[in-house]
């Protein structure tokens, strides 16, 4: 599917780029809940995406030094058993953070994940079908699944 990790990382970066518009909204605009976006606010969308990027970052850190990832096994099992309840708990954690901390992580976490993926041997993620599927699910596929939410939130901010 991908020739090398840089191809994946370029695609991921391009897919993430539209979401960076959220950082340009005021705190007040980020707080407005949008019924057509799961009832989420811009801040909620930021937290939801970042929560899963954070899990992906932990997996990348583990794969940098090992053939497997306990975090990935945990995440897969939790999702299979609890699905939306897991999402709700992650979102509740992000809602407790000060908005400045959400913004700081929004500006740094995606780049940190990309950075870690550059040091993970490609055989452990890019050329490993299950691990690649995991990273796609938590990045580009996840972003695509929430593009409509992003559009609703950005329209609601104007």
Language model features: what each stretch is:
Residues 13, 28, 85, 127-128:
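Short hydrophobic/aromatic segments of transmembrane alpha-helices and their interfaces
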